[in-house]
Amino acid sequence: MLRNRDYARGRAQVESYGSAPVIMYEPLSGRHGNFFDPAYSAIAVNPDWMRRFDKVHAQAARSLPLPQIDSTRRWRELDSSMSSDALLMNVFCTPEVAKSAAIRSALGVEDSAEPIFGWKARVPLTNGRFDRTEVDMRLGSLLVEAKLTEVGFQTRTAAIVEAYRDFDTVFDHDRLPRAEIATSRWMRASEFPENASQEFESIVADPAVVSNVDTIFRPPGEPGYAAYQLIRSVLAAYAADCSFCVIHDERRPDLREEWFQIMAAVKSAALSVRLKILTWQELAAHLPEPLQGFLDVKYGIVSPGKLPSAIGASAELAD
């Protein structure tokens, strides 16, 4: 947060409310504080890319002040300093990056197609329909999931995950990480029905030990799966005959471990070799120097063997 706060100085932005604030940037005079200038210029003239700004920030009404420049403008997800989609577009919308032979080699992509952001995968379900899966990016035959600061890869109930047509074909169920999905709020003991609260009767009935403390419980949840986003994306890659890569920050080994768990549960060797992992730091080594400087100052992302610049070094990028 300190790095983002320093980078934000002199740019059109506000800070969210709460104990874990984020910086929200506004567009101004053809520039956007959350974006590398050449990337944003390329986005602005590409209607498909610009359409990504249609996604309104879901928490804006209760967690964000009004924009400073245009108070009628609604905050977008891509305005957030914590947006992994913004980071992804900063990299791949910068001219010549997606066509770079070094980048294609790092990603294992042979064709030089234009990036598609928010690609609709239409993963088939057992009922003959398709889900509304949106993959962060498709680059030729490669699907990409981008991560920055997100907590994890979400969880879903078993009923939802097992409703995908190819779930049994692709995965060994027993090797997938499980999770209990909460289906109701935490409850106090006094709210439980008679047959569920009898264990407290011996205490409650004794005035000598009665207490004002009302024990809190969470009723059992539904069985589910962890890393749902990864499971879904692997199924999308299988259905579309694509490869799939997770790009994450090397400072997040927890995300890497989650991905390894999912890869280990894939049955097919032919599909397994199409599943990849890459860090932003590894990718940075192949990027143009000006973009590397932007990633360093704004995100603290530098190529392997280098140290991030000191906080306070952002003045040279301000204009």
What are these regions (language model features)?
Residues 1-127, 309-319:
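Nuclease-adjacent, charged terminal/linker segments that flank catalytic cores
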Residues 113-140, 150, 186-193, 222-225:
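Active-site metal-binding core of divalent-cation-utilizing nuclease and nuclease-like domains
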Residues 137-150, 209-212, 233:
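Conserved catalytic cores of phosphodiester-cleaving nucleases, focusing on short active-site segments
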Residues 157-239, 243-244:
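Acidic, metal/cofactor-coordinating or nucleic-acid-engaging core segments within structured domains
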